[in-house]
């Protein structure tokens, strides 16, 4: 069982262009990736360039807030 103050945390990356266009219902869904990051080395929110299957192109995926 992981400690609550663990350095490595599991985060979710979400497509930024899909979330902006989801208001207008242009795409059928929102692309999400899960990964792990080290809180000590990367204290700020992580952004990565990933492929979005709904936009059919590489877009910036940003870290989203964890919902428990």
Curated annotation (Swiss-Prot):
Record GO cellular component, one term: ribosome
Gene (name only): rpl33
Species = Pinus thunbergii (Japanese black pine)
Q: Which family does it belong to?
A: Belongs to the bacterial ribosomal protein bL33 family.
What biological-process terms (Gene Ontology) are attached? translation
The protein's matches in InterPro entries, at most eight in alphabetical order, are given as: Ribosomal_bL33, Ribosomal_bL33_CS, Ribosomal_bL33_sf, Ribosomal_zn-bd
Name used for this protein in its record: Large ribosomal subunit protein bL33c
Keyword Plastid present in the record's keywords: the answer is yes
Subcellular localization: Plastid, Chloroplast
Question: GO molecular function terms here?
Answer: structural constituent of ribosome
Q: What is its main location?
A: plastid
Specify whether Ribosomal protein is a keyword of the entry. Answer: yes
User: Keywords, A to Z?
Assistant: Chloroplast, Plastid, Ribonucleoprotein, Ribosomal protein
Residues in a coiled coil are none
Question: Cross-referenced SUPFAM superfamilies, in alphabetical order?
Answer: Zn-binding ribosomal proteins
């Amino acid at each position: 069982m992981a400690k609550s103050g663990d350095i490595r945390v599991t985060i979710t990356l979400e497509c930024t262009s899909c979330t902006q266009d989801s208001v207008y219902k242009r795409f059928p869904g929102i692309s999400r990736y899960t990964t792990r990051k080290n809180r000590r080395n990367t204290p700020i929110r992580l952004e990565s360039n990933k492929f979005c299957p709904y936009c059919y192109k590489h877009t910036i995926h940003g870290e989203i807030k964890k919902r428990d």
